[in-house]
Design a protein with these regions (language model features):
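Non-catalytic, soluble scaffold/interaction modules
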Residues: 1-169
Length: 169
């Protein structure tokens, strides 16, 4: 358990640095208001209730930190997704965005949604896009996108509007 907790701590530090970098870039390109969206992402990393539950689940179920973090984060996301308020329901996407970053860092994977490989202007079709991925879109390469989930109040939609990228969410 101590090794798994140490790995989690390192992944949280790395994720925080990544989110701060996204926030900095968004602030430069879109302004402070849009960059403040990522304050909620940073708060997830500091949520003691969530982190304590991850520790408890690891100990009780004797599972890896990846499994425990994934299970707990998805439980929180489902809870948010079930709330009868559009704004709060959209925060489930934020939880999943942060969880994906943490899990990728635990697993040593590259950042999710890296579209630097696009060679020509494209329209992106996806089940979902996180706000942090959307914020990093190159307007010269991404002409627009469509997702199955989201709404006009989602952080992904806000990022698209700020970048002036047409989107159907």
């Amino acid at each position: 358990l101590p090794n798994e907790l140490q790995r989690l701590e390192q992944a949280l530090i790395q994720t925080r640095q990544q989110i701060l970098e996204v926030q900095r870039k968004v602030g430069e390109v879109m302004g402070a208001d849009d960059a403040s969206i990522f304050d909620a992402h940073l708060l997830v990393l500091e949520d003691r209730t969530l982190l304590d539950e991850v520790t408890r689940v690891m100990a009780q179920k004797r599972i890896s930190v990846e499994q425990a973090f994934g299970q707990v984060a998805e439980k929180y996301a489902k809870t948010l997704g079930a709330i009868d308020d559009d704004y709060l329901r959209e925060r489930a996407a934020d939880m999943r965005d942060v969880a994906a970053r943490v899990l990728n860092n635990l697993l040593g994977r590259h950042e999710p949604g890296d579209l630097k490989h696009l060679k020509e202007p494209s329209i992106i079709i996806s089940y979902d896009l996180s706000p942090s991925i959307t914020a990093m879109f190159d307007k010269k390469k991404v002409l627009g996108f469509a997702t199955d989930v989201g709404s006009k109040t989602s952080h992904t939609a806000i990022m698209a509007r700020s970048l002036q990228i047409p989107a159907v969410v």
